[in-house]
Amino acid sequence: MTRTPVNVTVTGAAGQIGYALLFRIASGQLLGADVPVKLRLLEITPALKAAEGTAMELDDCAFPLLQGIDITDDPNVAFDGTNVGLLVGARPRTKGMERGDLLSANGGIFKPQGKAINDNAADDVKILVVGNPANTNALIAQAAAPDVPAERFTAMTRLDHNRALTQLAKKTGSTVADIKRLTIWGNHSATQYPDIFHASVAGKNAAEVVNDEKWLAEDFIPTVAKRGAAIIEARGASSAASAANAAIDHVYTWVNGTADGDWTSMGIPSDGSYGVPEGLISSFPVTTKDGRYEIVQGLEINEFSRARIDASVKELEEEREAVRALGLI
């Protein structure tokens, strides 16, 4: 194996999602079965010991592709020469916490990380923000990294995309492999809009197969949007393995490309497409090739979809104004 290892940084590495993610990265599922990796685990100081325990387990797996592990609490060290950064660590919302407090707390995490990426990362760096509120955390990090092309900062809506695939498959008696061209629009929040109007199920238009707008509005959309809360209710903990899986999917697709005739959903800086204000990090339908993504153009947006996209975009604009007022962007 003569390939130069890819440096992959994972923040919040000792957490639940980090634990579900790291072994899959080290086994080759993030970038490909022939791509060696070096891991950089970034944690807050009190969690370094737990991160060391995870690193011990990674060593004990003897993954042929894993060519080194560094553990640090210094973002400048963690992002030195980074090619792929998975920003998982974030401040979760606690009971009674106002949204402004949440945004402020996360600004204290993502602004310094953005600067560290700006100052230290490799020229080809790709960033995926997983930690919530993911879209706006990505915006904060991106604003702190003016020397890095804006399109390198993305937010994860692939979990919502995957959730929607399964719900649609169940409704139509098909499998997820039968479904193509599903879209998540907007924010990774309860306002997100999973859109089946351009999707296909075994080659047939998904909306026509379903033929039930009441189910879409009252069942499908809320089920996808509130799935995280339902998992916390059932499991007593937030979704970790499914979030890690979606992060793997997001980066793998970004690097290796979407299948012909299909697309995926990514939270990316808007170029003004579909009436989403430029610069907002919003979820769009995208195709990927050679490590680059492009927004799928020319989709007709019906009234049902337009109102829901606009509502989610409005929330993103409000979040942007809130972090601007806090001096975070």
Curated annotation (Swiss-Prot):
pH dependence: Optimum pH is 8.0.
Organism in which the protein naturally occurs: Streptomyces avermitilis (strain ATCC 31267 / DSM 46492 / JCM 5070 / NBRC 14893 / NCIMB 12804 / NRRL 8165 / MA-4680)
GO molecular function: L-malate dehydrogenase (NAD+) activity
Protein EC: 1.1.1.37
Pfam families: Ldh_1_C (PF02866), Ldh_1_N (PF00056)
Catalytic residues (UniProt): 188
GO BP term, pick one: malate metabolic process
Enzyme class: oxidoreductase
Family: Belongs to the LDH/MDH superfamily. MDH type 2 family.
Sorted UniProt keywords: NAD, Oxidoreductase, Tricarboxylic acid cycle
Domain of life of the organism encoding this protein: Bacteria
Coiled-coil residue spans: none
Protein name: Malate dehydrogenase
Temperature dependence: Optimum temperature is 42 degrees Celsius.
Binding locations of NAD(+): 12-18, 106, 113, 130-132
Function of the molecule: Catalyzes the reversible oxidation of malate to oxaloacetate. Exhibits remarkably higher catalytic efficiency for oxaloacetate reduction than for malate oxidation in vitro. Highly specific for NAD(H). Can also use NADPH for oxaloacetate reduction, but catalytic efficiency is 97-fold higher with NADH. No activity detected with NADP(+) and malate.
